[in-house]
Design a protein with these regions (language model features):
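Alpha-helical transmembrane segments and their immediate juxtamembrane cytosolic regions
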Residues: 1-212
Length: 212
């Protein structure tokens, strides 16, 4: 619970920063239109809720389990329908604010999002068998990063998979996964919570200052 709360609260703060770039922080947007859109922590928060749901289902707590699995998966479609159904600017502003902060939606996230939710669930479901887990991960990579992309953008050529649609390269993660011995390494958990947001905004500030 503490781990989830840390991830979630940081994701809310970073989501609020991103929302401000879209709505009130125009002067801080780089002249070429770029600004940080890093919401990986929001992706993790959504995934953790879904995984908790699978755990509850495994313990036959079906009500809360199915709710925890289905709500994070389906909520973006509900929010999108609510946005489409109304042109009220205050209502739309509120829905956008909630979607960037306290109620993140996987379909709206540029950094991770739906892919993180999908891959996280696949890894969790096959967690009891290392080799089956890795095979499932590789198959999901092929289907999501190659087959899906070809269906969505049929005009892609081979070079595009190295310059535009390069997400398939996460297949190479199979190598360290095979080498992992299953034990937790040394590290400072507090360092991560500071480093992740700080390095993003420091690097952005430098790029903003040096931009020509």
């Amino acid at each position: 619970r503490k781990y989830f709360l840390r991830i979630y609260l940081l994701s809310v703060l970073m989501g609020a920063v991103q929302f401000s770039f879209y709505n009130i922080g125009f002067a801080l947007v780089r002249p070429d239109g770029f600004f940080p859109q890093n919401q990986m922590l929001a992706s993790f928060a959504i995934l953790l809720v879904a995984l908790q749901g699978f755990d509850w289902c495994a313990r036959k707590k079906w009500g809360r389990g199915l709710a925890a699995v289905l709500i994070p998966i389906l909520s973006p479609f509900i929010v999108s329908a609510l946005m489409t159904a109304s042109s009220n600017p205050i209502w739309l502003f509120t829905l956008n604010l909630l979607s960037f902060t306290v109620l993140p939606q996987h379909l709206f996230i540029m950094d991770g999002g739906t892919a993180t939710l999908l891959f996280g669930i696949v890894l969790y479901l096959f967690r009891k068998n290392r080799y089956l887990q890795i095979a499932a991960f590789a198959l999901t990579c092929v289907l999501w990063d190659i087959a899906r992309v070809l269906l969505m953008m049929p005009g892609l050529c081979l070079s595009d998979f190295f310059t535009v649609a390069y997400e398939w390269m996460e297949l190479f993660a199979v190598v360290p996964m095979l080498c992992y011995n299953g034990t937790k390494g040394r590290g400072s958990k507090r360092f991560f919570y500071w480093f992740y947001p700080v390095h993003i905004y420091v690097l952005y500030a430098l790029s903003f200052a040096l931009y020509r």
